[in-house]
Amino acid sequence: MTHIRIEKGTGGWGGPLELKATPGKKIVYITAGTRPAIVDKLAQLTGWQAIDGFKEGEPAEAEIGVAVIDCGGTLRCGIYPKRRIPTINIHSTGKSGPLAQYIVEDIYVSGVKEENITVVGDATPQPSSVGRDYDTSKKITEQSDGLLAKVGMGMGSTVAVLFQSGRDTIDTVLKTILPFMAFVSALIGIIMASGLGDWIAHGLAPLASHPLGLVMLALICSFPLLSPFLGPGAVIAQVIGVLIGVQIGLGNIPPHLALPALFAINAQAACDFIPVGLSLAEARQDTVRVGVPSVLVSRFLTGAPTVLIAWFVSGFIYQ
């Protein structure tokens, strides 16, 4: 049987992965933009069918041979490793995100390019783990603990859970939240200092200065073909929000349009998370296939009305 070896690329992490080209398996890819070139190469070498997770939904878990993602360090990095599905990240992202504990080298590899995928011979069998020896010299009554011991063990377990929760929280803040905040701040600073922000602001001012313009902006952001690519990390919404806020401060945009502008630039929020969320909920294949386009269309249909409602409410706030 053909084996496919996948190694990490430049600056990548994890691996190498060795996949058996078992007939009937499928390649699911959840990536923004065009179909990655490594998907075509994997399909050519394995003979597996490639499934677009955004358009066609996720196949049954037993049918997934490998998952290809383009996550920069959020939840998507760990969703498939948590289910022990071989995962290829086209970005050079290591153990990161809320599910970082499930990202291990034997199931995850990142920074992969076409040249990192090769065909090898039969895989070397892994040595079987040695079974655990159990001590059966004691009776069951001798092995049971008393009430005081059980209370102590329960308290110790509770303290351990709370301590681990605090440690995971701090770890997530340091490794995920703070770096992302620094990235967005640096990006906004570069845009503002380079003069690109003024160019974008002048282009947005006609739209953001009138309710109908905000409705048009919401329709653009929530358009089903664009919203999955505008949503990741809410970076675009944050940048546009800063630029619009500056224009409001300068008096170029009326203050009472701040609330509808907030709804307009966030009309695409979470559209990129739909396949991941359905996977977390272990939804059926038919549910994913129908649910993804349904939510995208619903966001498109509800984006403009929410802007109008916000504009109506803002009339009572700013008087």
UniProtKB/Swiss-Prot annotation:
Positions in the Cytoplasmic compartment: 1-176, 221-228, 278-296
Every PTS EIIB type-5 domain range: 1-178
Inducers of expression: Regulated by an unusual system which consists of the activator GutM and the repressor GutR in addition to the cAMP-CRP complex.
InterPro entries noted in UniProt: PTS_EIIBC_GUT_C, PTS_EIIBC_GUT_N, PTS_sorb_EIIBC
GO MF annotation: an example: protein-N(PI)-phosphohistidine-sugar phosphotransferase activity
EC number: 2.7.1.198
Active site: C71
Sorted UniProt keywords: Cell inner membrane, Cell membrane, Kinase, Membrane, Phosphoprotein, Phosphotransferase system, Sugar transport, Transferase, Transmembrane, Transmembrane helix, Transport
Catalytic activity line of the entry: D-sorbitol(out) + N(pros)-phospho-L-histidyl-[protein] = D-sorbitol 6-phosphate(in) + L-histidyl-[protein]
Bilayer topology: Multi-pass membrane protein
Domain of life (superkingdom): Bacteria
Pfam families for the chain: EIIBC-GUT_C (PF07663), EIIBC-GUT_N (PF03612)
Membrane-side (Periplasmic) residue stretches: 198-199, 250-256, 318-319
GO annotation, cellular component aspect: plasma membrane; transmembrane transporter complex
GO biological process, one term: phosphoenolpyruvate-dependent sugar phosphotransferase system
Transmembrane segments: 177-197, 200-220, 229-249, 257-277, 297-317
Family matches, as PANTHER family: PTHR39427, PTS SYSTEM GLUCITOL_SORBITOL-SPECIFIC EIIB COMPONENT
Domain notes: The EIIB domain is phosphorylated by phospho-EIIA on a cysteinyl or histidyl residue, depending on the transported sugar. Then, it transfers the phosphoryl group to the sugar substrate concomitantly with the sugar uptake processed by the EIIC domain.
UniProt name for this protein: PTS system glucitol/sorbitol-specific EIIB component
Organism: Escherichia coli (strain K12)
